[in-house]
A protein has these predicted regions:
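Membrane-interface helix-loop-helix modules in multi-pass membrane proteins
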Residues: 1-38, 177-190, 196-241, 246
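Membrane-water interface regions at transmembrane-helix termini and the short interhelical loops
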Residues: 2-5, 82-86, 109-130, 199-205
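Helix-loop-helix module between adjacent transmembrane segments
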Residues: 9-115, 185-189, 223, 231, ...
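Hydrophobic/aromatic positions within or immediately flanking transmembrane alpha-helices
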Residues: 11, 101-104, 124, 134, ...
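Juxtamembrane transmembrane-helix termini
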Residues: 27-34, 82-92, 121-124, 144-154, ...
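Membrane-interfacial loop-to-helix junctions in multi-pass inner-membrane proteins
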Residues: 42, 55, 59, 124-128, ...
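Small-residue-rich segments of transmembrane alpha-helices in multi-pass membrane proteins
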Residues: 48, 130-144, 218
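Helix-loop-helix junctions that connect adjacent transmembrane segments
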Residues: 91-98, 143-185
Length: 246
């Protein structure tokens, strides 16, 4: 939306990184998880894998996960608060607490309830539902901003973007080698993300890994194409209809 098509290299890097994660990490990790006691968490797996250093590995890995995921979780709570604020601002009055603050509290409460009550299965099911909603939105919204009222189609959108900044539709314009390398290496993060790795550990059997990989990569490909399309053509839609692009 802001930087143009050059930012799509991040999506390509994520796609490649996820694919290699499925190919290189998932089968081996699932096999090792079964071999070392069917651990269900990363600290437990490391402790079972290296029993002579189990306590230190549990402690260090747990601290790292808690510290870095605190920031990750906080971003989700902020998003929930902003969504609640934008959706219900001026409709409900919560006294001294703002709509944003109430949104954060509701988001936190819902997540805590289904996590504590349902555990990992509940988290996986809600992730599946959220993923379906996201993919549906990322398929529908690009079509809406292109072909809906005020969209104008591909030709009008491309013309609008070229008039604003011709580099918005370029894959390389204004992109240095370091910038490109930084974008495509985002996918390396998948190799160490705990919430992804534990799902590899939880796959039913080793034979199910290719099936899960195909489903996951298919979802990711569709979603990334939709996200890039929405970002690019959404800016054209905003400009054509006089919306605030900030």
């Amino acid at each position: 939306f802001v930087s143009g098509l050059g930012s799509a290299w991040i999506g390509i890097g994520l796609l490649v990184g996820a694919l290699f994660n499925w190919i290189l990490v998932a089968p081996r990790l699932r096999e090792q998880t079964v071999h070392y006691g069917n651990a269900i968490t990363i600290p437990a797996f490391l402790a079972n894998r290296f029993p002579t250093r189990s306590m230190s590995l549990r402690t260090v890995s747990a601290i790292v996960i808690v510290v870095f995921f605190a920031v990750y979780t906080a971003s989700g709570l902020v998003a929930g608060g902003k969504l609640f604020e934008s959706a219900f601002s001026g409709i409900y009055n919560f006294g001294d607490m703002s709509n944003y603050g109430m949104g954060v509290m509701i988001t936190l409460g819902v997540v805590l309830i289904y996590t504590v009550v349902g555990g990992f299965l509940a988290v996986s099911m809600t992730d599946f539902v959220q993923g379906c909603i996201m993919m549906l939105a990322l398929v529908i919204m690009p079509a809406v901003v292109l072909f809906g009222e005020g969209g104008g189609g591909f030709s009008q959108a491309s013309q609008t973007l070229n008039e604003v900044d011709p580099t918005l539709l370029s894959w390389t314009s204004g992109l240095t080698f370091i910038g490109w390398l930084s974008a495509v290496t985002w996918g390396l993060g998948y190799f160490g993300q705990p919430h992804i790795i534990v799902r590899f550990m939880a796959i039913r059997t080793l034979k199910d890994v290719p099936i899960a990989r195909n489903i996951g990569m298919g979802w990711m490909l569709i979603s990334l194409i939709g996200a890039v399309s929405l970002g690019i053509f959404g800016r054209a839609y905003a400009i054509r209809n006089g919306l605030d692009i900030e």
